[in-house]
Amino acid sequence: MDDKQHTSSSDDERAEIATSNQDQETNSSKRVHLKRWQFISILIGTTLITAVITVVAYIFINQKISGLNKTDQANLNKIENVYKILNSDYYKKQDSDKLSKAAIDGMVKELKDPYSEYLTKEQTKSFNEGVSGDFVGIGAEMQKKNDQIMVTSPMKGSPAERAGIRPKDVITKVNGKSIKGKALDEVVKDVRGKENTEVTLTVQRGSEEKDVKIKREKIHVKSVDYKKKGKVGVITINKFQNDTSGELKDAVLKAHKDGLKKIVLDLRNNPGGLLDEAVKMANIFIDKGKTVVKLEKGKDTEAIQTSNDSLKEAKDMDISILVNEGSASASEVFTGALKDYNKAKVYGSKTFGKGVVQTTREFKDGSLLKYTEMKWLTPDGHYIHGKGIKPDVTIDTPKYQSLNVIPNTKTFKVGDDDKNIKTIKIGLSALGYKVDNESTQFDQALENQVKAFQQANKLEVTGEFNKETNNKFTELLVEKANKHDDVLDKLINILK
């Protein structure tokens, strides 16, 4: 084995202090957290990187590799013998790599732990890209909309921008091959590749279609965004990756330069990431020598403390942290520390509640094992696993911003009884249509509103909630979410 790391993160296209399964948990039913790009990402598949944000935590418990006892050795010998027998004597030829992976997967599955998993070499690569925030590609954010792959925006200074790619460009081919019917992640995989190699995109812009050659480069995706909203500085932290602490420090300094005294740290739908980054970020606001998080394994505990003086420009700032049920892991470590030291007031809704830390061990073949090794507590000793952190002031998320994705493989009509019908009603109500109940029944009144929706959006008027209606419904909810961040607006009004 090569590196041993402790992770506190989530997963591919997700991650946090624990594992790459965090998003799968918070979105087990594909729950939509309507927070700007996050909402788009979940609802219509916007993706810039397929990131497994893992956490490199602290190795604090000195472990000695001891010899196996007789029982363990016997079990290991048995596994080895079964592998050899099946690999050599089974009547059909077996793939030795698949047998090995199946054995490992079986052991991990037996843990019944959603945060422990074995990653292949390819999965490990994605996982590490999530940790670093770096990947090789063209730097264009894409989304799937109405069965088309569309560029949302090229990153500033990226190869895509330099090549002339524009927002709303529709990609029809990659390297001369049609992408019709392909999933968004498949297209992203095709667009990516080795550094300094070229990819040719066939782009449709209006009635014009042309080929654009773009050289792939290493792209860094920033995890922090700063905006000035009146007299309040809003710093959005999307994940905890390499140098998120540096990005946060820069954002705080910009806010100070702008003369702002009130800062909102927006951690909504932040699944976590690197634990050491969470500690460094807390150190911006918490003085030297203070405990940020306590790690515990059995009877062994260690307090991880700040190592530097806090940022002087942040000392007089009024800090507010905005969280929701999608804020997990490293987000909770950071929030818990600032809350315990009264350095920030917490707003929003209760956080996810992930209080365990994973360790990663990477093997020589590039694969990786991630497993839960310890739990963590806040400085005051609060164990938030399964409980979350309650905000000091609750700001409820509008119902339409927490909808489950409606599968577009099914059509709903009068007489149907389905949980997705409640989602349809909530969404239509948010879009201004008259809905008098939120039951799971598709009644005549709902049919009338669906017809009105279809007519207003120039769709075939059937009264049935079909694929085309669903796509437009989703698109309009996304637009509404992007135009109106109700929760953030409420918080800014509170802070005025």
Swiss-Prot record:
GO molecular function terms listed in the Swiss-Prot or TrEMBL record: endopeptidase activity; serine-type peptidase activity
Keyword Membrane: yes
Entry's Gene Ontology cellular component terms: outer membrane-bounded periplasmic space; plasma membrane
Biased composition annotated in UniProt, kind: Basic and acidic residues: 1-16
Protein name per Swiss-Prot or TrEMBL: Probable CtpA-like serine protease
Domain of life: Bacteria
Polar residues biased stretches: 18-27
Source species of the chain: Staphylococcus aureus (strain N315)
